[in-house]
A protein has these predicted regions:
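Short, Lys/Arg-enriched, disordered terminal segments
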Residues: 1-5, 393-396
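Short glycine-enriched loop/turn motifs at secondary-structure junctions
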Residues: 8-10, 335-338, 383
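Glycine-rich, often proline-containing surface loops adjacent to acidic residues and nearby aromatics
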Residues: 128-131, 253-258, 339
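Short, well-ordered loop/turn elements at secondary-structure boundaries
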Residues: 92, 124-125, 254, 310-313, ...
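Substrate-recognition/cap regions that form aromatic- and gly/pro-loop-enriched pockets
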Residues: 327-339
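Mid-to-C-terminal catalytic subdomains of enzymes
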Residues: 342-343
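C-terminal substrate-recognition regions of SAM-dependent nucleic acid methyltransferases
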Residues: 29-32, 176-324, 332, 346-396
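Signature of N6-adenine DNA methyltransferases within the class I
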Residues: 2-28, 35-59, 63-232
Length: 396
């Protein structure tokens, strides 16, 4: 990691590969015999140094956007092309490309995804792309179109998941190292932390399953409507036992009272006075535009009508972010908060559903391990929709 100010490191996504574990993994994943290697975001040269130590002298095409980075002694600045790699005019096709691209959010996703896309187009047939990237890459909506394209032209052959978010200085980032090979006829299997697994591509979302799992799988969205919870936009104001007008589920055993009114003033003078005391901060909420006609409204009354039409029916709730091993539970449909997703059975599903068995599968390590990041389970609506569940767990 450089000694640049932390703000600059974060702005440019400069999380250099000082970890011996990550450097060794990149070298281990090089299965071709390249004589010329592309490093599109060389930084100070950690990966190039490690490659030369492992394989001897190799020719490297190195690119870096920041000419102020102090290079390692083994890297000659004359051999580095300074500038924006994504705009370089390049025609050479590579047998091997390695890198730890910058992790910087953009309007459409993240800069490292753009690096993957550009480098994918620079691979020769049978070429390998070995990158260190945030571990949620294979679950991101913004990455799905790229992954769909990559899976038509090749596959991910190796993945290393350290499950350690402390591998970079001044940052907590859970990462994976992947090897992708541009060969469309390869089997859809992957060495995942030295265990051979089946690789499952569901419309650009990648999950993994045991080679011994021979039962069929079905998409959650084929059996459930997956709903996101409501967002008040100011919990300190709307969550109130004294003036609450409705109950909102925030966990398996947590149900809180919240204020939700359709019009102001309401029939409760004390409630009106309470809300008026917070009017300024409610108007200043940034979730959407608030003014004199809607300042007392919630930030996002998401799925209020859909939930209202299903109140009291059986459903499954899934925690979106938790370290608990129980991420799902069966309950009745009720209004619920933003920390959970609700799985409401579809009336036109292919089969009747056994919710208890479905919850058992969702809570199994087989399912959870696809969405664990340094011990934390994290899942979003699209990811859950595209997730596969064992059809024995869902059909009766």
């Amino acid at each position: 990691m450089s000694r640049h100010p932390t703000s600059k490191i974060h702005d440019k996504g400069q999380y250099f590969t000082s970890s011996p574990l990550l450097k060794q993994c990149v070298c281990n994943f090089v299965l071709n015999s390249p004589d010329r290697v592309l490093e599109p975001s060389v930084g100070r040269g950690d990966l190039v140094d490690s490659m030369q130590t492992t394989f001897g002298l190799l020719d490297f095409d190195m690119y870096e956007i920041d000419s102020n980075i102090k290079l390692l002694p083994c890297i000659d600045a004359k051999n580095v092309t300074y500038g924006d790699f994504l705009t370089q005019n390049m025609c050479y096709k590579y047998k091997t490309i390695i890198g730890n691209p910058p992790y910087v959010r953009t309007s459409t996703g993240n800069l490292y995804i753009d690096f993957i896309q550009r480098c994918h187009g620079l691979l020769e047939d049978g070429g390998e792309l070995i990158f260190i990237v945030p571990s949620d890459f294979m679950k991101l909506t913004s990455a799905a179109p790229l992954i769909r394209h990559m899976m038509t032209t090749g596959t991910f052959t190796h993945i290393f998941r350290p499950n350690d978010e402390k591998l970079f200085e001044n940052a907590s980032i859970d990462v994976i190292v992947f090897r992708y090979c541009l060969e469309p006829d390869l089997e859809r299997t992957v060495m995942y932390n030295n265990e051979l697994k089946r690789l499952i591509n569901t419309n650009g979302t990648i999950t993994f399953a045991s080679m011994h799992d021979t039962t069929g799988n079905v998409k959650i969205e084929d059996y459930f409507d997956v709903l996101v919870g409501m967002v008040s936009g100011r919990e300190s104001v709307f969550k109130n036992e004294q003036f609450g007008t409705m109950s909102v589920r925030n966990g398996k055993t947590t149900v809180d009272r919240y204020i939700m009114i359709d019009n102001f003033p309401s029939d409760n003078d004390e409630l009106n006075l309470y809300l008026l005391q917070h009017k300024t901060e409610l108007i200043e909420r940034k979730m959407r535009k608030f003014g004199e006609t809607n300042w007392f409204k919630w930030g996002a009354e998401r799925n209020y009508t859909k939930v209202s039409n299903k109140l009291g029916e059986d459903c499954i709730y899934v925690r979106m972010l938790t370290r608990d091993t129980e991420i799902a539970f069966v309950e009745k449909v009720s209004y619920f908060g933003a920390g959970m997703l609700a799985l409401i059975p579809k009336t036109d599903a292919p089969h009747k559903l056994d919710l208890t068995k479905t919850v058992m599968f969702l809570n199994s390590s087989q399912f959870r391990e696809n969405y664990l990041y340094s011990g934390r389970f994290k899942i979003g609506q699209r990811q859950l929709c595209k997730s596969l569940i064992n059809n024995i767990a869902t059909c009766t």
